[in-house]
Amino acid sequence: MVLTENLKENDINEALSMTGVIHLKDKNLGDLSGGEFQRVLLARAISKKPDLLVLDEPVQGVDFTGEIALYELIKKISDELNCGILLISHDLHTVMSATDHVVCLNGHVCCSGSPIEGAKNNEYKVLFGEQASQILTRYKHSHDHIHTSEGEIKKN
């Protein structure tokens, strides 16, 4: 894939810095680890400050700790650049717990909507089982507080 226009050095450095790989700027891609490679690809994708970032299996070839860091980075980039994320993934845990809208494909669109709506869909239940729809779906809170990922409770 070739970028269609030249980028300014400043834009390249900013994207590499944002993804934490500015120190790898002059390295050969073949010398990078899986996580480094994915971060460089992510830097390339954000270098033009897109409105929509399309990511196909963005944590492929990355260890578990690196996966967490990459997903946190993707969220940070989405927030800072104010861009939407279209995430293609087979990682059902991430898809169902960290997304706003899900489209489940199995040769056709089985279901779409919020993760909670998707998990209630009969085709979803047939594909992944009743247990998956209960375990993998984010619990929707209707109280005056939220639970943070650090386990803290914060008032709304």
Where are these regions (language model features)?
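Conserved ABC ATPase "signature" region
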Residues: 6-24
